Structures are given as C-alpha cells and as structure tokens.
Amino acid sequence: MPEDKKAAAKVEPLRKTRPCPECGKPSNREHYPFCSNRCREADLSRWLTGAYAIPVADDETKAEYPDGEN
C-alpha cells in the first residue's frame, strides 16, 4: 500500500521546461515562461517603455474607409 501512495503522489509536468527568454536558465512554473520574478519584471519593463514594438508599414497606417470616415 505505501508504494501506491508514492506512485500517486508523483506529478508529471504537462509541458517540457523551456529556457527563460531573458537569461536562458530553465523556466520556473510560478513565473512561466521566465525563471524568476526579476526576469519577468525586466520583460514587462521593456514592454511598458516601448522597447518592444510591432513594426507597421507606412501604407498600413493610412487606413481607407469605405464611407470616407477616419
């Protein structure tokens, strides 16, 4: 019976651990996909300061509306 409890207590991860996108260390479940709160906050800071941006082509910025509205 004790062996059954031990086998049931083992938890299998749903996905393989991936490296942290900031520093390359193995990711932590609590801070996924980062390894620590420090790396998570560093990434958030880059988003908030505009360091990350989605490039937009010039012709995409001038949207043409069928009704002539802007």
Swiss-Prot record:
Keywords (A to Z) from UniProt: Metal-binding, Zinc
Residue sites binding Zn(2+) per the record: C20, C23, C35, C39
GO biological processes: regulation of DNA-templated transcription
Gene3D superfamilies: Erythroid Transcription Factor GATA-1, subunit A
GO molecular function: DNA topoisomerase type II (double strand cut, ATP-hydrolyzing) inhibitor activity; zinc ion binding
Pfam families xref list: YacG
Cofactor: Zn(2+)
Compositionally biased residues, Basic and acidic residues: 1-15
Annotated coiled-coil segments of the chain: none
Family: Belongs to the DNA gyrase inhibitor YacG family.
Quaternary structure and partners: Interacts with GyrB.
Functional summary from the UniProt entry: Inhibits all the catalytic activities of DNA gyrase by preventing its interaction with DNA. Acts by binding directly to the C-terminal domain of GyrB, which probably disrupts DNA binding by the gyrase.
Protein name in the entry: DNA gyrase inhibitor YacG
Organism encoding this protein: Rhizobium johnstonii (strain DSM 114642 / LMG 32736 / 3841)
Gene giving rise to this polypeptide: yacG
